[in-house]
Amino acid sequence: MPLTWKDSGLRWYWVVVLVFLADQLSKQWVLANFDLFESVKLLPFFNFTYVRNYGAAFSFLSEAGGWQRWLFTLVAVGFSTLLTVWLRKQSASLWKLNLAYTLVIGGALGNLIDRLMHGFVVDFIDFYWGKSHYPAFNIADSAIFIGAVLIIWDSFFNSKSEQDKTEEVK
């Protein structure tokens, strides 16, 4: 029997909305208050620094000439659709997977909007040690990372009762 939205992982879709709004509001704040490459030191190891990312994680393919914008758009739409279908098919009680999928979807959609509106992703979270800087990122990237970690965690530490719930839904 198909699950209703209340019984399925779709019940967790509020996380998508929360991540998306936090990401977009933070990026709009950066765009309104920072010039490109402007930096504000917040802690001895942490800045807000406005940079543009034309690629993916760690600026992967950022110098590819523009076609990557559409590749990453297709990837974001594809993964968001796939994870939404999976949410629809699994029990709302599988909190780790539901939270993981919704974090990834919210992050993917946040970066997708940037790519479509600006042609780049707004990054601004800048951790560093001495003169070594970790690549700048944003709230969407953080959500995707945390979601991926939860998916991996769940795959290694999924309890027998949670596996049974997943099997019942299939």
From Swiss-Prot:
- Which top EC class is given? hydrolase
User: A Pfam family this protein belongs to?
Assistant: Peptidase_A8
Mind telling me which InterPro entries this protein's record contains? Peptidase_A8
UniProt keywords, alphabetically: Aspartyl protease, Cell inner membrane, Cell membrane, Hydrolase, Membrane, Protease, Transmembrane, Transmembrane helix
Q: Where are the transmembrane segments?
A: 12-32, 67-87, 93-113, 137-157
Where is this chain's protein located in or outside the cell? Cell inner membrane
Q: Which GO terms describe its cellular component?
A: plasma membrane
Enzyme Commission number(s) from the entry: 3.4.23.36
Pathway, per record: Protein modification; lipoprotein biosynthesis (signal peptide cleavage)
Q: In which domain of life is the source organism classified?
A: Bacteria
GO molecular-function terms, A-Z: aspartic-type endopeptidase activity
Catalysis performed (reactions):
Release of signal peptides from bacterial membrane prolipoproteins. Hydrolyzes -Xaa-Yaa-Zaa-|-(S,diacylglyceryl)Cys-, in which Xaa is hydrophobic (preferably Leu), and Yaa (Ala or Ser) and Zaa (Gly or Ala) have small, neutral side chains
Role noted for this protein: This protein specifically catalyzes the removal of signal peptides from prolipoproteins.
Q: HAMAP family recorded for this chain?
A: LspA
Protein name in UniProt:
Lipoprotein signal peptidase
| Organism this protein belongs to | Shewanella sp. (strain MR-4)
Q: What is the lineage of its organism?
A: Bacteria, Pseudomonadati, Pseudomonadota, Gammaproteobacteria, Alteromonadales
